[in-house]
Amino acid sequence: MQFSSYEDLRSRLLSHAVTCEAVARHYLDRIRSHEGDNIYITVFENEALQRARSLDLKLAGGGTPGRLFGMPMAIKDNISMKGAPLTCASKMLEGYTSVYDATAVLRLEAEDAIFLGKTNMDEFAMGSSNENSAFGPVPNPFDNQRVPGGSSGGSAAAVAAGLAMVALGSDTGGSVRQPAGFCDIVGLKPTYGRISRYGLVAFASSFDQIGVLALNCDDAALVLEVMAGVDGKDATSSAHPVPAYAAEMTDVSLKGLRIGVPEEFFNESLNPDVASVVRAKLEELRLQGAELVNLTLPQSDYAIAAYYILVTAEASSNLARFDGARYGYRSEAADDLSSMYVKSRTEGFGAEVKRRIMLGTYVLSAGYYDTYYKKAQQVRRLFQDRYREALKGVDVIAGPTSPFPPFGIGDKTADPLEMYLADVFTVPASIVGMPALSVPVGYDSLGLPVGIHLICNFFEEGKMLGIARHMQRPDSSRIPAPSNH
């Protein structure tokens, strides 16, 4: 059972060529066959089948199908679903069950989506390889000795391997886009505030956004349209009107389109194969009528440093609530209240989370606040001003999604700084708050996926998806990805 896109699935469902229950069973069977890959932390087998049957009855009874009728979806395990485990891939949330639904989940459910389960991730969304999970790493569907990227590695692998049609992830500095690039799928981070964060476990609140991972731009656009919009439960959500992204997307032409290409994104640290694939695709667009405009973004060298100061500072505050007293893991070795806090956090958090909490606490401490945190905030403002200025002269900024192709499991775990550089091209859009996405455009000499990263102005998701749609390959909806299992 294969579907070229959700539109294909929907037409078959509405014509009664296939049932929601049969579709759900197909995906659940595939999930079961990949059980050893750690892609899902929790599978909603009974709930998904029950939901599918109720949707079949709705259609048979003449009910109006929702915009996502029968779409099989996966949810990253830092997004709340009432009555379901919420682990954030951490020992700290061992045994915790969410008591409410995220706004994004409610909106998807209202349009008749089917939730298959919760996907693996880097612990508390901190990582670029999905190796920082208490449940173990997730292999890349293209090569099971390599990482799928992170922190939404489980969601990316689920879509790429045909274990979900679309998945939700969260993106703080590239956690949707980078794994999308590594797994040969589309990964979209919307404008900050475009999707409500209510129900998303906070990592860095001024950066976090729920994003979409899909096989193609059309499916990503539809899911974004359903989730987008103001929410009274999230004061940072935007009241900016939600357009029909699918319609906006198809109106985008390459003729006269100005594509900004920053020279800083093609420096000597960029893998030669990645550079070659990206430049070839940009040249292809030029031959189809687009104009390539050379840009200079000198602040790019400061992106990683500023980002890790700001997000670790926010993380140290956000994660203070996980103390062993209210919920989650509590150490049995504690003798008193003070040791309960210390031992619960020491035993409950993984190494990378503890590293970031300590970094954040340090940059917020007396004597260092002005030197680090305040300076990083000033750099953030410079980024915002420079990117606004750059996008006055071009329609989109384009470059590689990652400086290198998917790397081997264990290759970078001993060097945190090298791991952090995996997000060097995705972090700027997060610092600025602009929408960005990764679209697959080719393969390196080893057959590993390469993605192009696009950044557009605030709330220009429709235009960005339209540009990406011109880039995606005709076979972009294939299921599943190649695998050496």
Swiss-Prot record:
Q: Which GO terms describe its biological process?
A: translation
Active site annotation, chain numbering: K76 (charge relay system), S151 (charge relay system), S175 (acyl-ester intermediate)
List the catalysed reactions.
Answer: L-glutamyl-tRNA(Gln) + L-glutamine + ATP + H2O = L-glutaminyl-tRNA(Gln) + L-glutamate + ADP + phosphate + H(+)
**GO cellular component terms?**
glutamyl-tRNA(Gln) amidotransferase complex
Q: Which InterPro entries match?
A: Amidase, Amidase_CS, Amidase_dom, AS_sf, GatA
User: Does the UniProt entry include the keyword Protein biosynthesis?
Assistant: yes
| UniProt KW keywords | ATP-binding, Ligase, Nucleotide-binding, Protein biosynthesis
State a single Gene Ontology molecular function: ATP binding
Q: Which domain of life is it from?
A: Bacteria
The EC code for this enzyme is: 6.3.5.7
What role is this protein assigned?
Answer: Allows the formation of correctly charged Gln-tRNA(Gln) through the transamidation of misacylated Glu-tRNA(Gln) in organisms which lack glutaminyl-tRNA synthetase. The reaction takes place in the presence of glutamine and ATP through an activated gamma-phospho-Glu-tRNA(Gln).
Assembly and partners? Heterotrimer of A, B and C subunits.
Family from the record: Belongs to the amidase family. GatA subfamily.
- Under what name is this protein listed? Glutamyl-tRNA(Gln) amidotransferase subunit A
Record the organism.
Answer: Chlorobium luteolum (strain DSM 273 / BCRC 81028 / 2530)
